[in-house]
Structures are given as C-alpha cells and as structure tokens.
C-alpha cells in the first residue's frame, strides 16, 4: 500500500516523518508533494518526492494537508489522477464532504490530529463519508494509531471535537500560563521553576486520573478538604472561570463557522 501526503506545512511534515519513523512504510511506498518543491527536498531520504498528480495516481491513501482556501484548487488538480478506489483524507474540519463531492466523488475521510502527535499521544478525530467501508476504516485507524489514539465522530461533531483535542493544547497552555504569571507575583521562586512545577503537576494529575479512573470532582474532593486552603482556590475557579470557558467556546465556534462559510464560498466559485 502506498501513502501520499500533499502539503508540507506543520501537519503534513509531522505526518510524513511519523509515518516514516514507525518502520511500517518503506521509502518507496511513502510519497510527498508540495507546491514549493525546494521546501520538501529534505524529505528525499525518507519518501518519494513528486508532483500532486503523480502522487494521486500512485497512492492508495492520499492525505491533503493544505489551507481551506487552497483545497478546491488541489482537489481539482488531482481529481482526474486519483485511483477509483483510493481513500482521500483531508486535514481540515472546515471543508465538508458535500464540498469535496462537488470536485471529486471518492471515498473520503477527515482527520484532525493534535500537536501531541509529536510525542505519539494525539487524540486524533476522524470521520468518514458514506463511501468508506469497514476495511478502509481499519487501515486508516491502524495508520493513525502510530501517532496516538483515534476517535471516530460524526461529521457534525468534528468542530467541537477539534476544540476538545486539537485546539485544547493551546487552551491548556494559555490557562496555565496565566496561572504561572499570577503565581510569580506572590513568590520569589524563579519563573522557570514555577513553570516546571506546574507542568509536572499537571501531567501527573492527568496520568493519575486516567490510571485510577478518577473524575475531576474526585480529585477536587481529595485535595480540597472542607475549610482548607485548596477549597478557597477551587471556589474562585468554579465561581469565575465558567464564564470565561463559555466565552472561549462561543468565540472559537463562531470563528469556525465563519471559516466554514469562506470555505464553502471558495467551492462555489
């Protein structure tokens, strides 16, 4: 089976090098194409570097890792070259299956990885159009399992799923950046040490919850004893943070809606 990746941006590059390093795909079965060929020359040692149409004609699974505004042009470019039974995989939640079908009507999946794929712990969202059978789903899931866990959702839930896994590293980093900055104003502990302490505690808390099957409330109850210091802090968080979380999702989901509208307009041109 031959795997192809069109686009050598952050996600395309990550997938290429992860697929190469897992040892399951030979160099001659891994293809990469990019609009600027010079940018992808560094991959010549691990993959076949070629143009979009050659990649589409040779590969059984074709990942398209380009911006929404470029998607229609790329799909139009490769439409006549795709194999009849190839699986097209897009990495953009704003592009719907209905949009894609206007250009090319093939088996299609949408995949949304997370930044944590870099350490093989991605929570990767995937959804499929009605042409994809169980065998293709199994093949793609096995391929994506090399970068973490695969979570299948219906297309209408991909947006919120993306917020929870793909956007979440940025949300989490922002939240704990605020906490560390606030802590710095109350202590002589160096900022670098504060960050390390918080990161290690955050990571260990997540592992503890997963390994012991604890809920958030379980952890809060165990740490925030009645009348204690931690309880004072958790009260503030539960009183004040819900409005910030609601506004965060309102803003991001609205931006996602507007992005989808722009993408739809580009497919109607």
Segments predicted by a language model, with ranges:
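NAD(P)-dependent Rossmann-like dehydrogenase/reductase catalytic/cofactor-binding core
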Residues: 199-269
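ADP-ribose/adenylate-binding Rossmann-like module
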Residues: 82-96
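Rossmann-fold dehydrogenase core element
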Residues: 87-90, 100-115
